[in-house]
Amino acid sequence: MCIRDSKLTIDELANRIPDGAKVALPPDYAYCSLTAVRALIRRKVKGLHLVGVPSLGFQADMLIGAGCVDTLETAAVTLSEYGLAPRFTAAVKRAEINMMDATCPAIHAALQASEKGIPFIPLRGLIGSDILAHRKDWKVGDNPFAENDPVVYLPALKPDVALIHAPIGDKYGNVWVGVRREQMLMAHAASETFVTVEEIVDGNLMDDLKMKAATIPGLYISGITEAKKGAWPLGIPGGYNADHEHLQRYVDLAKTCLLYTSDAADDLLCVD
């Protein structure tokens, strides 16, 4: 596949993610496409089922505040040193979103089941926790190879869309994600993967032995958009730092405002 077949504008990328889609998103520290999130908010997407791989932060809070989300499936929603996620917290208190509590190992294991094409996967660590009472789709059963050894069976988790950011893509649609291997799992598990990248380079990343091991092959990528500082106001490792002033301003405003969109460093919009 050549990039001409998969290269999209940011609004075209957002239009490829339908209302009601199950969308896998990485945590704040792992190459988030905030530029795509803002595009989704601009087009007023509705009814999203967000999957945190394994947790969520600013992306989810922004989408919830804009009224784009029906369901969250994640191990946590946190803004790290910025504190609680204000729009998420308000939505939960008002019972405006459906929460599917999970754990980090459960999210990763269920995605691995989808990646491998198997219908379910066993996991031990959930037994004895209260979370099982809230996840009727998780079943406790016997280990078929041992006696008196219960395990939890998790159904495969197959997102409709994985949405990520990355430092580099190439004209063949290959995407280099570096050490952030959860993006690779997301792309393998999801039906489609859309990526924003800092730069589209000449050549083939799969031909470079130093880059190949950390590159998602283009066959897993449904669309790619070149977006400089596409993770802003978050940062990317080895690229640019998070815009702490802007993030704090968001947190302060989001405590009382429902809608957040932003396309420039000096542009924060909210609607009471």
Where would I find each of the regions flagged by the language model?
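Internal active-site segments that recognize and position negatively charged phosphoryl groups
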Residues: 134-175
